[in-house]
Amino acid sequence: MTAILVQQQHNVETSPKRKADESLQMARRAIASTVDAMDKHLLAVNNGIHSHPELCYQEVFAHATIADFLESQGFKAQRHAYGLDTSFEAEAGSGGRLVIFCAEYDALPDIGHGCGHNLIATASIAAFVGAASALLALGIAGRVRILGTPAEEGGGGKVKLIDAGAFSDDVSAALMCHAMPAHQVKDGKAGIAAFRTLASRRLGMEFFGKNAHAGQEPWSGINALDAAVSTYTTVSMLRQQIKPHQRVQGVIEEGGKVPNIIPDYTRMAWGVRSFSSSEADALSERVEACANGAAKASGCTVKITRAIPYKELRVNEALSATYVSEMVSLAKDVLYEDDEPSSAGTDMGNVSHVVPSFHGIFAIPTLPGVPCHNRAFADAAGTPEAHREAVEAGKGMAMVATRILEDADLAAKVKYDFRRRSG
């Protein structure tokens, strides 16, 4: 009799866990079957965006392609969302908590999708439709939303969406995944969960001088190219005194037309990165001081324009750990975190300061030594193998979202991690 009572007590104690495990398995099956069934359509969307690269805030084709696809699957897509022409939004479910999937799709000048944003869009679309099917299968309250986030490449699209109210207080999590060359992920892992990035600043500099004949009467000119070259040189010397994790990169976008005319106008662009926003701001001031000094020395005037600042990406431990565990169920061994933060910057960092956020990494095959922001990486981002990795990452994110919506304890842990990081 005692043994029977013990067994009955054991059954009572384990049944909630067994029920939860069964729900998770049901959700995984629903996500996998739904996403796999529409894979050829996802591939068409992915290939279409990849073959039509568009710069920030000009993503007309990508915007229409994704919105059309969502509507073809029975979702209502709100185009031109939050006052941005190339943003969109669609939602599934009702009541409960809310999880957002962020879809990027802008490209780079000259090299197309050298950052693989077509794959980011594909992963988030797969995550959204997969999570929507899981909500139906489980019959639980909760909402998932896909948000088109244009202009990550310097345009600060997510920052504008934050200001417009897209990431409100009722958002339990915002999720996305980014592609990375496989050789940059150590130990042959399939990706990185707790991915960290630097705060970044972008500066535009214009120098104004005076034209003159460079051979006949150079003393009558004020050389704007001298100011730009001097700025570049002094910043290069400044790099000796910056911290190892800090980055300063610059280019001369316009430096004159012909050598026999002293340039009266030149233009530069700079990127500044550091661990924190305060460090990035301080380093930016030092770069600006180089420009001001160069302008004064050459007799030019300078105009400095500051782009929307990107904040450092805050990691959410609960979201990252959940993603790692869910990728195991997809036979993907994902690294929890790398030893050092990436030197990249993203406007998802700004989102991570507003709501709990996840910015995972999935590895894609490339030629040896190929980095991001490279034409060869753009080629790799258009392969079937890269598409497959994006879709698998999407399935993982779909399960993370489902678990947040289904499990109040996990949702509380996610919120706790966010508040702890927010200080």
Give names to the regions the model predicted.
Residues A3-Q7, P16-K17, S23, L225-G423:
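Metal-dependent amide/peptide-bond hydrolase catalytic core
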Residues T86-E91, D106-G114, N118-L119, L135-P263, ...:
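Histidine/acidic-residue-rich, glycine-tolerant segments that coordinate divalent metal ions
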Residues R97, D170-S172, V334:
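Local beta-strand N-terminus motif with an aromatic residue
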Residues T2-R145:
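Acidic/His- and Gly-rich active-site-bordering loop/insert found
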